Amino acid sequence: MTTLRKLPIALAVAAGVLSTQAMAVDFHGYARSGIGWTGSGGEQQCFKTTGAQSKYRLGNECETYAELKLGQELWKEGDKSFYLDTNVAYSVSQRDDWESTDPAFREANVQGKNLIESLPGSTMWAGKRFYQRHDVHMIDFYYWDISGPGAGLEAIDLGFGKLSVAATRNSEAGGSSAWINNQRKDADKTINDVYDIRLAGLETNPGGSLEFGVDYGRANTQDDYSLAPNASKDGVLLTAEHTQSMMGGFNKFVVQYATDSMTSWNSGHSQGTSVNNNGHMLRVIDHGAINLAEKWDMMYVALYQDTDWDNNNGTTWYSVGVRPMYKWTPIMSTLLEAGYDNVKSQRTGDRNGQYKLTLAQQWQAGDSIWSRPAIRVFATYANWDEKWGYNNVDKSPDNGLAQNGTIGTDSRGKSNEVTFGAQFEAWW
């Protein structure tokens, strides 16, 4: 009987412990979804200039997308701790009630803080991770992003700044081959490793700081496998970024230079098996978000990127845009986004241009331009004139090369369109 009396107490204690542990799980993420129409008929179209690496996103997103993050501090003793972080991402076309998709397992890592006595404040980590990503939110453009499986040690306090070192990996389809038993065998995948060194928090002026980074990427073939003779093999990405606190927000000025394998994505990912990316890239970005007045906030971006490839298939991309926000109440606002992209083909010398305007009425959880969740209704107008595109004829020797006109290319020609709809966006 004594044992039976103790059993409910034990179960209650166990339930309490499990409940406490469950409550300690951190749930973070990002999501957006909505519905839209095109003025000429059909579902919402989205508009991106051929040759540009991004588009102005307000009222110009045509998919349902979500990142669901679960994490928990697994152990803590004094200032030492271990934290598990995971992230699964989904993307569907938002055409149907039931839309199945294969999720992307984006993150699964453990971060250990203050594990090295001689390096207080540092974090040791290993696993798949979004690693110190730098982006321009209004065009959804990640200009410094080496995310992937990896390991590193970050935030090493040097007194004048903080040092971080990491190694990450991604892969390319095919890319290398070998002769085995007198037969050619092509690899299904060839991995690329990236080695990253960053020095951040260098104070330059009141409210201002510098960050420098060096990324070296190279293709890493299996034993007995080799790359094509003219493959780029490796490359570097150099980054300098100045961040200035100003007008209730911030401004970031970025200069980047990349070579060879690091010029395909221009973000820190390497494609060393490619024979088409020998050359260099120069990029300059100025972007930020500021408070203009009591009822006015604004995001802005100006970007220049010149990719000069030996095969003359590079581009010069200019982009400039603003997104002012007028706050009628602490939870209701009107936004206007105006953006212009222009991309010149290195091969043809012609240009593709597009300007896009979006007017949105928004209800959001707060009075900042960053406040989310938000529900918005929008109308978008886009006008484009494209003189060139990339050859998209299967098995053509010129497939993937820039050429004039719309026949046999992905050029959109010259046209304009109107779309309208509603969308929610949230992060937490």
Curated annotation (Swiss-Prot):
GO terms for biological process: monoatomic ion transport. Residues 1-24 form the signal peptide. SUPFAM superfamilies: Porins. The record marks Y142 as: Important in sugar transport. InterPro entries: G_neg_Bact_CarbUptk_Porin, Maltoporin, Porin_LamB, Porin_LamB_sf. The record marks Y30, Y65, W98, F250, W370, W427 as: Greasy slide, important in sugar transport. It is found in: Cell outer membrane. It holds the Pfam family LamB. It catalyses: beta-maltose(in) = beta-maltose(out). It is a multi-pass membrane protein. One of its GO terms (molecular function) is maltodextrin transmembrane transporter activity. Keywords: Cell outer membrane, Ion transport, Membrane, Porin, Signal, Sugar transport, Transmembrane, Transmembrane beta strand, Transport. Induction: By maltose. GO terms for cellular component: cell outer membrane; pore complex. Homotrimer formed of three 18-stranded antiparallel beta-barrels, containing three independent channels. Involved in the transport of maltose and maltodextrins. Belongs to the porin LamB (TC 1.B.3) family. This is Maltoporin. The gene is lamB.
